[in-house]
A protein has these predicted regions:
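Short hydrophobic/aromatic beta-strand micro-patches
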Residues: 31, 48-50
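Catalytic core of pol beta-like nucleotidyltransferases
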Residues: 1-27, 35-41, 54-102
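A short, structured beta-strand/loop element
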Residues: 42-43, 47
Length: 102
């Protein structure tokens, strides 16, 4: 993948907002090297979602398909997880550095 600035990356990710919301997401965030501005050419794209557990649990199979679609569109590996699944020892730093997409 060519290096893409954060604004361009966020614009592409926002095109998936409806699909993510239809599958239970209430927010989408970039974290990791692309959020802090130090990606390497081989860096993946780390994303986490928020969801309202009382209204709808994310359809993980559909999220995996969205993850695959994004990987193809961007030309890099994409990993989508939930905020609740973030590692407890790293969660505070991840949340601090995360960039909200939607």
């Amino acid at each position: 993948m060519r290096f893409m600035n954060q604004a361009a990356l966020i614009e592409i990710l926002r095109t998936y907002d409806t699909a993510l919301r239809e599958n239970g997401a209430t927010g989408l965030f970039i974290f990791g090297s692309r959020a802090v501005g130090v990606p390497r050419p081989d860096s993946d794209l780390d994303l986490f979602i928020d969801y309202d557990p009382e209204s709808k649990v994310p359809n993980m199979f559909r999220l995996m398909q969205i993850e695959e679609d994004l990987s193809k569109a961007l030309g890099i590996p994409v990993i989508i997880t939930t905020r609740n699944a973030l590692h407890p020892l790293m969660k505070e730093n991840i949340e601090r550095d995360a960039i909200r997409v939607s």
